[in-house]
Curated annotation (Swiss-Prot):
This is Uncharacterized protein MJ0717. Pfam families: MoaE (PF02391). One of its GO terms (biological process) is Mo-molybdopterin cofactor biosynthetic process. InterPro entries: MoaE_sf, Mopterin_biosynth_MoaE.
């Protein structure tokens, strides 16, 4: 499930903890934020922020479905911010509900790598 409002993501996270209680062994999470620099050819370059188009949400829905089909996980929640993001702003939050940490971490790594293709 994908969200463009962080508060909705947090609310759904709490709901899923209750819904899946006893079924999941871990929740593997990731939170990404805008840095004060970018890396260009291995060099740090000052950043003023980043622009994220809203069409990324549709692309990320497909990534979530792919991850659910590829890895043995219970559920995936994904928040992604859009518009111009200033330094320090949250870009994304991901929560993977899994029976075991191995599958949870593998799914999370896959999602992050796919997401980075659109940044």
């Amino acid at each position: 499930m994908i969200f463009n409002e962080y508060e909705e993501f947090c609310k759904k996270m709490d709901e899923c903890i209750e819904k899946y209680k006893g079924k999941f062994g871990c929740i593997v999470t990731f939170n990404g934020f805008v840095r004060e620099y970018d890396l260009k050819d291995g060099e740090k370059v000052p950043s003023k922020g980043m622009k994220i188009d809203e069409d990324i949400l549709e692309k990320l829905k497909l990534v979530i479905e792919e991850a659910k089909n590829k890895f043995d996980v219970i559920d995936i929640l994904f928040y992604h911010n859009t518009g111009f993001l200033s330094i320090g702003e949250r870009i994304a939050s991901i929560a993977v509900f899994a029976r075991h940490r191995k599958e949870g971490f593998e799914a999370l790594e896959y999602i992050i790598n796919e997401m980075k293709k659109y940044h």
